[in-house]
Amino acid sequence: MIIYPAIDLKDGQCVRLVQGRVENKTVYSDAPANVARSFQEQGASFLHIVDLDGAFQGSPQNLKAIEAIAAAIDISFQVGGGLRQLSDVEKLLALGASRVIIGTRAVSHPDFIANLLDKFGPERIVLGLDAKEGMVAVEGWVSTSSVSAIDFGLQMKALGIQTAIYTDVSRDGLLQGPNLAAIKEMASSTGLDIIASGGVSSLDNIRALKELENDGVSGAIIGKALYDGKIGLVDALREAESKF
């Protein structure tokens, strides 16, 4: 199982929000590239980067910071947040992103996903599937759609999506542990390769997610728990790679 340390960008800084709310912001670093380099030095193989300003404004806003991160590391990274135009996707892939994450736009314009898959392939286009009480959350989690998260996952799988980052919005940044039942149901019901996000806050959580590997859970994104010292990245990586 792959552990993805998270870097959330706002105004060029590395921050964390609680449940996606800007008023619940903690700034962890003015130099996100240094944070990225530190994660690489500790053994991470893949980073998860979110442009929070982009998510709220609908187009990438932290390209300078992302470019600096790309220059600072030799490992893979995926980026999401406000990717609603083909040109923005092309820009991020050109900056060195291994994968881009499409969320809101996939809900309102499934044809956009189909076009991206056709142009770049499923290895480079990942679905950002954010859910609140079983329904798809959109627009930087500000609103909830009337679409069931599982139905949406099935629809995207039918279009050719292979990998989805599944975030339970109600758990994000609260360090309460992931919603294991919902994650397992999403993976087994849709057949998508699921990267779990939201609430991972202990090595026990990582062990529990690792037990869902056979159901289709291939990774976990960890943010706040790393920054607050609840989990050490080296320990998390060791746990994720261990054989039972």
From Swiss-Prot:
One annotated GO molecular function: 1-(5-phosphoribosyl)-5-[(5-phosphoribosylamino)methylideneamino]imidazole-4-carboxamide isomerase activity
Localization in the cell: Cytoplasm
One cellular component (GO) term of this entry: cytoplasm
Keywords, in A-Z order: Amino-acid biosynthesis, Cytoplasm, Histidine biosynthesis, Isomerase
Reactions that this protein is recorded to catalyse: 1-(5-phospho-beta-D-ribosyl)-5-[(5-phospho-beta-D-ribosylamino)methylideneamino]imidazole-4-carboxamide = 5-[(5-phospho-1-deoxy-D-ribulos-1-ylimino)methylamino]-1-(5-phospho-beta-D-ribosyl)imidazole-4-carboxamide
Superkingdom: Bacteria
Known EC number: 5.3.1.16
InterPro entries: Aldolase_TIM, His_biosynth, HisA_bact_arch, Isoase_HisA-like, Isoase_HisA-like_bact, RibuloseP-bd_barrel
BP terms from Gene Ontology: L-histidine biosynthetic process; L-tryptophan biosynthetic process
Predominant subcellular localization, coarse grouping: cytoplasm
Catalytic residues identified in the record: D8, D130
NCBIfam families per UniProt: 1-(5-phosphoribosyl)-5-[(5-phosphoribosylamino)methylideneamino]imidazole-4-carboxamide isomerase, PRK13585.1
Family according to the record: Belongs to the HisA/HisF family.
Record HAMAP family: HisA (MF_01014)
Protein name, entry field: 1-(5-phosphoribosyl)-5-[(5-phosphoribosylamino)methylideneamino] imidazole-4-carboxamide isomerase
Species assigned in the record: Syntrophomonas wolfei subsp. wolfei (strain DSM 2245B / Goettingen)
